[in-house]
Amino acid sequence: MTILRKITAVIVSILLPFFLLMTAIRLVFQPVFLQVEYNAPGFPEDPYGFTVEDRLKWGGISLDYLFNNAGISFLADQRLPDGAPLYNERELGHMLDVKNLVQLMLKVWLGLFVMLALGLIWAWRGDWVPEFGRAYARGGWLTLGIIGAILIAIVVSFDWLFTAFHRI
């Protein structure tokens, strides 16, 4: 294996966990996920009195906002049946931050997909698919290691992890 192939294999192994994580996040940000979650047995009642139908409606609108090109007015203009705004100013600021992070993640996710696909094409055309496959396998093991580390961090100090995540 040439040095360039070895470097590519290492890069693939490192990039794969990020691609898989972003793929999982993208799958969660789907209307069907809201349907499954809000209709799950034992899902807690809403403290503000929203019904499951209300939650699905407003959750769907909020998901739409994260993936469309609209400004914050898309959410700021949403009104509850009594005329009150759906989001207060603090929540709107948070949703804008989430949208910016999601939009950045989508761009990075697409870039990772292109890089991994180009690597696979190069490996296929260069007849080194087995080595490339081993790089994917190492990336898979690295992904499991990262998931394990995150789970340990959650068990040891959820509050710290939650705060650190929301500083991103």
Question: Which positions does each model-derived feature cover?
Answer:
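Individual transmembrane alpha-helix segments
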Residues: 68-111
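Membrane-interface interhelical loops and short interface/amphipathic helices
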Residues: 34-85
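Membrane-interfacial interhelical loops
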Residues: 95, 153-168
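Peri-membrane helix termini and adjoining interfacial loops of integral membrane proteins
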Residues: 85-86, 121, 167-168
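Membrane-water interface at transmembrane helix exits
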Residues: 21, 25, 29, 150-154, ...
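Hydrophobic secretory-pathway targeting helix
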Residues: 1-34
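Juxtamembrane interface at the cytosolic side of transmembrane helices
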Residues: 1-11, 112-160
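Hydrophobic alpha-helical transmembrane segments of multi-pass integral membrane proteins
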Residues: 16, 20, 106-117
